[in-house]
Amino acid sequence: MIALAENKLADLSMDFAVNVLKLTDGIKGHYSLVNQLERSATSIGANIREAKYAHSRPDFISKLQIALKECYETEYWLELMQKAEILSVEMSKDTLHDCGVIRRMLIASVKTAKENLA
């Protein structure tokens, strides 16, 4: 069952990264903010993928925790860009929602992995 959740999480994070790249494609004049958003959003899936091939359970947990931190950072950049009116709420609300879904899945996965560690 955990393997199915991990695969779903990997798939969701890949789709999420693609959606963020598409969302930011047309933004002009805010290179540094767009770069930060794209880096954190794509890092989520990269760390989830790395976790699948962790050397140990603690390494697995560490990779998921990094993905979780990147998820929180991505939410920050999305919210900032909304407040600064670089992204409209309408354009980014689904992306922000999806980020929250991934965040909650990561929290649950880390919790389960820590419980299984004991």
Region annotations inferred by a language model:
Residues 1-118:
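Amphipathic alpha-helical assembly/interaction segments
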